[in-house]
Amino acid sequence: MNRAEKREFVTWLNKIFQESGSVVVAHYSGLTVSQMSDLRSKIGEAGGAVKVAKNTLAKIALQGTKSESMANLFTGQTLIAYSEDPIVAPKVAVDFAKANDKLVILGGSMGAVSLSVDAVKSLASLPSLNELRAKLVGMISTPATRVAQVIKAPAGQVARVIGAYAQKGEAA
C-alpha cells in the first residue's frame, strides 16, 4: 500500500468508526481462509462487515472518534467487525467465537462507550433491532385482536340464541 492508499484507507476506516452502531475487535490468529470467509459471510448476511487492518492504521483512524478509547485493543493480528445495528456485529462475532476458539474477542465500542469482552458478550445476548420490532408489533396487535374478539362475541351469542330458538320452534 502506498501513502495515498493508506491515507484513503484511514479516512474510510475513520468514517466506519464514527458511523457504526458497534465495533468489535478480535484476534483471528490461526483462522483458515475458509473460516474467515465464513465469518465474513455470516456478518455480511446479518448486515455488518469484517475488515482486517494494520494496527497502526486502525489507531490513526481512531483518533478524533468517539471510539478512540479502544486503541489499546489493536495488538497482534486483529480484525474489526462492525455494523449499523449495535447488536449484529457482537452477536455474530460471539456466536462464531463459541464455535471456533481461534477467534478471540478483545473488546469493542458502541458509540462513545468502550466495551470489555464481557460487555460484548452481554450485548450479543440481547435481541436485535428487528427482533425487538417484531416483538413490539406482536404486543401492539395482540390487544387489538382481543378487542375485536370481545366486540364480536355478543353478536355471536345473539345469533346462537336465535338459532336455538328457531330449532326449538321447528321441533314443536
UniProtKB/Swiss-Prot annotation:
Entry keyword annotation includes Glycoprotein = no
Per its UniProt record, what Gene3D superfamilies does this chain match? 3.30.70.1730, 6.10.250.290
Among CDD domains, the record links this protein to: Ribosomal_L10
Stored SUPFAM superfamilies: Ribosomal protein L10-like
A single GO cellular-component term on record: large ribosomal subunit
| Subunit and partners | Part of the ribosomal stalk of the 50S ribosomal subunit. The N-terminus interacts with L11 and the large rRNA to form the base of the stalk. The C-terminus forms an elongated spine to which L12 dimers bind in a sequential fashion forming a multimeric L10(L12)X complex.
Write the protein's name.
Large ribosomal subunit protein uL10
Organism annotation: Bartonella bacilliformis (strain ATCC 35685 / KC583 / Herrer 020/F12,63)
